[in-house]
Amino acid sequence: MLDSTPTAILCFDFDGTLVDNPSDPYEIAQLEQILTHMGKRGAVWGINTGRTLFHTLDGLKQHGFRLTPDFIIARECEVYHPNEYRRWVDLGDWNSRCAHDHKKFYKAHSAFFKQLQKHLASHWPGAKFISDQTEPAGLVVPDDDIMAGICHWIDSQLPGWPGLGYQRNSIWLRFTHQGYHKGSALQEVRRLLAIGPEFTFAAGDNFNDLSMLRHDVAHGLACPANAVPEVSQHVDSLGGYLSQEDATLGMV
């Protein structure tokens, strides 16, 4: 990814943090100016998102970005970087380990997913369990209150299912191996670049960002004004920066 060790890592969630919907082209230009300035000082920047890699690249184009990130963490756990031919490829062997562990994870927790579907049918009929090639196990629900109730039930089941983890973002939830999330993926990027948490910045706005908004991952923490209350409170409790502006402008 780089010819020399960077001076710092800047890592942003995408939707709701780095970009708004719709985005303001002037705000994007301001952000790119700052990222360019930081790049000249040796920093690298990347996106840490629940989107797939290709959906993220489409999003960058849609929101008018001219800068290319130094790395992208997709689906909250897959790590990519542009090679010398500007093609996006795996960064190290993390993705192969991630795929291997998740294949075992979904098989080992198939009984839990069946139990969950029965529970949803009897308690939250509006919730939908998702299972396909793109998303082996996930949920979409009508509103945040229902999601909170379901997450409370899932949390009560965790002691009986070692390795069970999930990534919650608004009305969407993705089940994952407990060892793979935005925080652990960013730590892997740090390890490969030989950068400590004291030179790492992370910003996010939703529940799935909490795993990277920790001091063992990044000492510089921030969230935009549109962050969910739980994230704002968490960042504030760790002495992080709570922007008074939403999304892109909050990162400028």
Q: Where are the regions a protein language model picked out?
A:
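Asp-based phosphoryl-transfer active-site loop
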Residues: 3-24, 213
